[in-house]
Amino acid sequence: MAAEGKAIAKVNDLVIFVPYVVPGDVVDLQIKRKKNKYAEAEAVKFHELSPVRAVPFCQHYGVCGGCKWQVLPYSEQIRYKQKQVEDNLRRIGKIELPEISPILGSAKTEFYRNKLEFTFSNKRWLTNDEVRQDVKYDQMNAVGFHIPGAFDKVLAIEKCWLQDDISNRIRNAVRDYAYEHDYSFINLRTQEGMLRNMIIRTSSTGELMVIVICKITEDHEMELFKQLLQFIADSFPEITSLLYIINNKCNDTINDLDVHVFKGKDHMFEEMEGLRFKVGPKSFYQTNSDQAYNLYKIAREFAGLTGKELVYDLYTGTGTIANFVSRQARQVIGIEYVPEAIEDAKVNAEINEIKNALFYAGDMKDMLTQEFINQHGRPDVIITDPPRAGMHQDVVDVILFAEPKRIVYVSCNPATQARDLQLLDGKYKVKAVQPVDMFPHTHHVENVVLLELR
């Protein structure tokens, strides 16, 4: 399996990437795109199924863009993810490595996400079976997920296996009410229509947040919208935060928009080892809560804290890792690009009465400078959790200048992590590697690496 989650075939030395098949399948392929060194294809006929192939559990498999590895047993999924980490570190990093620990699989492989976002659209995607029936469908509104490669089309979802089933019940109830009362769904090309998006968040504390996003251009639409919200509140009393956002823009981003409370609170909490983390409608929080806890425990263990260390937490987000390790450190300094996330980090520190954590907002390469190090002190430990693109060269250079005793590198992209490890290799030796599976049935994998100063 390739890093993108596709299977690999070879024909006359041409490498071909094929989605929705597994090693051992015997298929006829149709080339869809050909480059100099590789091609992309789709399977048009199966002659023989692989002995390791599993039966997909989701009725939307193969059309929905998510959970593409359902056709692999979970034991095979994590085996390929382990290999993906090992291949990237060795092929790209080209550095000396210790024995790589077996991947930490997810105890939950279904209903493991704490957040899903659904899209409304008046352009329902018709499946191949529906198209072949050659029937004119009266109901072309849909609520579900975008179809890959067709931004204005949405696949109507009946059941999603990623989030607790309350999510399915809420989505389907809202859909049916909107159908029955003739609510307009957004046209993603013309931007006409009322209902846009719905975000559902659950938490380890049992709280439930629903955010409904709509476009309102006339007064009577607001009254209709509030009737829908009242229906949701009456139908699902377990909702602790029912919020709404008016989005009259031409895109779905909500970070610059006001959030209104229809019922309950404007936030909920996640808990971890007695720490409480405030999660708002716009907050970032790892979407697999159980595995996030395991990931943070690994990072803390690798950091080897004794209570005397100054720790820098780079790309701190809402400060979850920083606050999580603060009780074992002398001081923690978190840096993050998004100002709103830093405000959340400060609030979380205050909620948990953490006095030894400082947070700064700004672009990492501009914030983490030699002057910053000289002003705040050389860190004993750096924990870094960058985005998929990895760390900027300037950030790597300042880390090398700071010379912390240990670096804990948390990554959602082992390829860019391997590149960065090679840049650090002159001064640092990799001492431990621990892959973690945060997203079962996808090709994505997290990896935690401990480096020590040579």
Residue ranges and their predicted role:
Residues M1-H60, L358, K365-D366:
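Terminal RNA-binding accessory module
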Residues K45-V55, G62-S184, E218:
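Extended interfacial segments that mediate partner engagement and assembly in macromolecular machines
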Residues S101-K108, L188, L195-N197, P435-M438:
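Short, solvent-exposed loop/turn elements at beta->coil junctions and helix N-caps
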Residues A7-N12, G144-I147, I211-I213, A345:
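Short, acidic/hydrophobic/Gly-rich beta-strand patch recurrent on exposed beta strands
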Residues G24, Q163, N288:
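Short, conserved phosphate/pyrophosphate- and ester-handling motifs at nucleotide-, phospho-/glycolipid
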Residues A3-E4, D219-R454:
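Rossmann-like S-adenosyl-L-methionine
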Residues I200, G206-K215, R276-G280:
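Short, aliphatic-rich beta-strand segments
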